[in-house]
Curated annotation (Swiss-Prot):
This is Urumin. Amphibian peptide that shows viricidal activity against human H1N1 influenza A virus. It specifically targets the conserved stalk region of H1 hemagglutinin, and acts by actively destroying influenza virions. It shows a reduced activity on human H3N2 influenza A virus and no activity against other viruses (HIV, SIV, HSV-II, hepatitis C, Ebola, Zika, and Dengue viruses). In vivo, the peptide also protects mice infected with mouse-adapted influenza virus from lethal influenza infection. The peptide synthesized in D-amino acids is inactive. It comes from Hydrophylax bahuvistara. It is found in: Secreted. Changing residue 21 to A: Decrease in antiviral activity. It comes from the Eukaryota. Changing residue 26 to A: Decrease in antiviral activity. The name urumin is given by authors from the word 'urumi', which is a deadly whip sword that originates from the same geographical region as H.bahuvistara. Keywords: Amphibian defense peptide, Antiviral protein, Pharmaceutical, Secreted. GO terms for cellular component: extracellular region.
Length: 27
């Protein structure tokens, strides 16, 4: 289940999603 938002370069980006396999997808 992807989480809403992810830390990118130390900043929280609510448009990004971190998946359980470690992948990050940004809208």
């Amino acid at each position: 289940i992807p989480l809403r938002g992810a830390f990118i370069n130390g900043r929280w980006d609510s448009q990004c999603h971190r998946f359980s396999n470690g992948a990050i997808a940004c809208a």
